[in-house]
C-alpha cells in the first residue's frame, strides 16, 4: 500500500500502490486517503492528500474494459454502456507538497475524516450519481420487459413497476438534495 518514505520542508514523498475507484482514469485530480481501519504501527499509511493525475512518478494501471467483450450494444446492453474502469495508482516516489496534504500519519484523524464528518457522503457523490442513472435505466428496462411480455396491465406487475419508479424517483431526489 502507498505510504510515506520521506519528508522534507516541501512535502511528503509517497511510494507504493493504492486501489482507485471508478472514474479515476478520467479524473484530473485524485484524492488519496485510507478508509480501511489501520492497526498500531501503520501510521505511515494514515494519509490524506490530493494530487494531479499527471504528477511526476504517478502511474495508473486500469483494468481491461468490459466493453471489449461486449461489442454489440444489442446483445450486451448493460456491459456495452455501463462499464466502470477501476484502476490502481502506483506512486514511484511521488512528491506531494504540504499544501496538498490534509492528514499526515495520524491514524485517529484518518478514520475520523469519514466516520465523524460527512466527508464519505460527499466523496461518494459520483457513485450516487452513477447508481441513480442505473436505477433509472432499470426502471425503464423493467417497464419494457413487461410491455414485451404483455403483462403491463396485470395489477401485481403495475404495483411492482410503481414501486420501482417511486424508488428511482426517491433516489434521484436524494441525490439532487445533496
Question: What function would you assign to each model-found segment?
Answer:
Residues 126-178:
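Extended amphipathic alpha-helical segments enriched in small hydrophobics
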Amino acid at each position: 500500500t502507498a505510504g510515506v518514505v520521506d519528508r522534507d520542508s516541501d512535502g511528503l514523498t509517497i511510494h507504493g500502490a493504492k486501489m482507485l475507484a471508478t472514474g479515476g482514469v478520467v479524473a484530473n485530480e485524485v484524492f488519496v486517503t485510507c478508509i480501511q481501519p489501520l492497526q498500531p504501527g501503520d501510521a505511515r499509511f494514515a494519509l490524506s492528500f490530493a494530487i494531479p493525475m499527471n504528477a511526476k512518478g504517478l502511474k495508473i494501471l486500469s483494468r481491461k474494459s468490459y466493453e471489449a467483450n461486449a461489442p454489440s450494444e444489442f446483445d450486451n446492453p448493460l456491459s456495452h454502456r455501463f462499464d466502470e474502469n477501476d484502476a490502481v495508482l502506483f506512486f514511484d516516489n511521488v512528491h506531494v507538497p504540504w499544501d496538498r496534504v490534509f492528514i499526515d500519519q495520524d491514524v485517529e484523524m484518518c478514520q475520523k475524516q469519514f466516520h465523524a464528518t460527512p466527508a464519505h457522503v460527499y466523496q461518494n457523490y459520483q457513485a450516487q450519481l452513477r447508481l441513480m442513472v442505473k436505477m433509472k435505466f432499470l426502471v425503464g428496462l423493467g417497464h419494457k420487459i413487461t410491455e414485451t411480455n404483455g403483462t403491463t396491465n396485470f395489477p401485481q406487475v403495475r404495483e411492482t413497476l410503481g414501486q420501482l419508479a417511486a424508488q428511482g424517483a426517491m433516489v434521484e431526489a436524494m441525490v439532487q438534495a445533496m
